[in-house]
Amino acid sequence: MTTQTTPAHIAMFSIAAHGHVNPSLEVIRELVARGHRVTYAIPPVFADKVAATGPRPVLYHSTLPGPDADPEAWGSTLLDNRRTFLNDAIQALPQLADAYADDIPDLVLHDITSYPARVLARRWGVPAVSLSPNLVAWKGYEEEVAEPMWREPRQTERGRAYYARFEAWLKENGITEHPDTFASHPPRSLVLIPKALQPHADRVDEDVYTFVGACQGDRAEEGGWQRPAGAEKVVLVSLGSAFTKQPAFYRECVRAFGNLPGWHLVLQIGRKVTPAELGELPDNVEVHDWVPQLAILRQADLFVTHAGAGGSQEGLATATPMIAVPQAVDQFGNADMLQGLGVARKLATEEATADLLRETALALVDDPEVARRLRRIQAEMAQEGGTRRAADLIEAELPARHERQEPVGDRPNVGDRPAGVRSDRQRSAL
């Protein structure tokens, strides 16, 4: 903790999803190490993982699909997905309000998905800082992406009902912002991906968004991994934690790298596929339902990834060439960014045959220009500041340095004056 900052109560809010909890943990660990009292609102399934970094878990019941649920549980359309988040937010808000009724924090820290956190920050009159584990909106995003994406859903009866319910919930809580503005435009946000992964980074509002890059830590609690003796090249294959039901793809990976002279394959298959479904495995192939990904990437020569935000930045941070095989949502955009940076090749799942995987792998690992680009990006990421800079920026928002906001119930038009906005002078000091 810096000498200018008095210890504070910082409350973090997130959902039960690996891709949203994991990116925050090292930031939380750093805030605890600086002497702050940190609480972390989270469903029980992540309580132990959160507690291991130092905060006190504040448990709440969530109606969102769990971390090991099939992707189909989120629905098949954009509107299905957003309704699921809104339903959960509405039922979670009273739980969280009760949990913090006698322990109002000095600052609210929250994942981008935690609508209740932002409502409570307004109610309590405390600053709120969003942690974004993936890309953020740029100037022009609404016209270029959001409007075309939402044009049809808005015209349906279900779409109109969704917006009406969202607006009513916000108004019940004294917030006059449009739901899209409330959900997608926080007053202050720390972006936990490297700027290199952000589309149109030059058009991102730097008065709101600060790229601090990867906040990884050493991940010692995840265990280590030993590169086998004699392995000239190591390839890690992982489709993350959600979209892992791909036995045919895994079999193609075994065919591509199994018995390839000098190569060793580490294959993470998740909990929805069994090793038996992959057939006979050569001696140079190891299969696991989960692996300590960062520990392996620090020793790997190639990463076959779904291009989730976490995996993409870990590949960049370890300067590992990538084959991106996106499965859903933002992964397709991430894959495009990686390919555009010249450090990866993007393949569709259906075209990722053994022959093409092997051909692409050999081209990537033998290309000195790919290695040079990766080293440059790795150096740029190191300059973004990571965990310590994130903690510094959070401390800068604390009431000791920050004008405390009036509670939402005591002032009109709260949506027009979001909590947590600093002056240009305060920002330039950082």
Swiss-Prot record:
Compositional bias (Basic and acidic residues) spans?
386-409
Q: Which UniProt keywords apply?
A: Antibiotic resistance, Glycosyltransferase, Transferase
- Report the GO molecular function annotations: hexosyltransferase activity; UDP-glycosyltransferase activity
Q: Which GO terms describe its biological process?
A: antibiotic biosynthetic process; response to antibiotic
Query: SUPFAM superfamilies given for it?
Result: UDP-Glycosyltransferase/glycogen phosphorylase
Task: Please give the residue ranges the record annotates as the region Disordered.
Answer: 385-430
Please report which protein family the annotation says this sequence is part of: Belongs to the UDP-glycosyltransferase family.
Name the UniProt record assigns to this protein = Oleandomycin glycosyltransferase
